[in-house]
Amino acid sequence: MRNSVVAALVASFLLLLTHSVWSAQAQPPQKATYAGNEVCKACHAAQVEKFSKTVMGKIFISNPRNDLEKRSCESCHGPASEHVAKGGGKGVGIPVTFRKGTEESATAQNEACLACHQRGVQTYWEASPHAGRGVGCVNCHTIMEKTSDRFQLAKVDDKTPFFNKRAQTEVCGQCHLQRKAALQRSSHMPLREGKIACSDCHNPHGTPNPVMLKQASVNENCYACHTERRGPFMWEHVPVMENCGNCHDPHGSNNDRLLKLTDPRVCTSCHIYDFHPGTPRGLTSQFFFNRSCTNCHSQIHGSNHPAGKRFTR
């Protein structure tokens, strides 16, 4: 009887000891806490001063709208108590860093931004081609200092005029080299002049449309400016209604009016076997061969004239 009691006590003690050891091992590590903006400013005064001049800095420091924004530096970088306890240093004890050369993944960096920027133009970010290719917000935007009048665009070099729409062209052109090169062609959209920007046609944060177009189709995108081409027309030109890109290269061309080919070659790319009426050998007449089709067919985008079937009026 006595042996049974002793055995039971020993078993209970061992079970209690095992539970204590397991509990100690299972105990999660102490989480970092928020140190406060003044603690950050004690070491990073220059950075805080630059940040305070940005749109985001003015909100966080002077007019925070919620508890997250009140944390200022730690709103994006996370709790800094561990960073302070370890004496600071680049990347030491900081949950999220955004500096160049950091080992932080683009996904982790973007999550800090998406804590606030979830709606509006950022709605489709997670499913966007840029997110899928590991592009980080800081690849296009600068956080800590004001570099552009809008969008906190990343600074490419000291010569780039970052206070007009040309800034977007420079930022996008860092990756989209072919598109940037096309803008140097004789016929081009006025992006390099700063009259329009890439974001007038595309949403770089993602859309449910092809090639991140702001509108549902290429034509709808073009009609946003070229309203006179929208129609509906009594006589419609099918390739035009199908896709403006059938004839035009929107980023730039060495042909007039952004045409992919010279006129009439852009027409004969479809009208291969169409012989011109009134000529004995089709297009071999000196009055028609290699001449501009639009000299006569001037309403090529569509016509509302009762006799405009051939787009001549």
Where are the regions a protein language model picked out?
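Short sequence/structural segments immediately N-terminal
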Residues: 17-313
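Bacterial N-terminal signal peptides
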Residues: 7-19
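N-terminal secretory signal peptides that target proteins for export/translocation
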Residues: 1-3
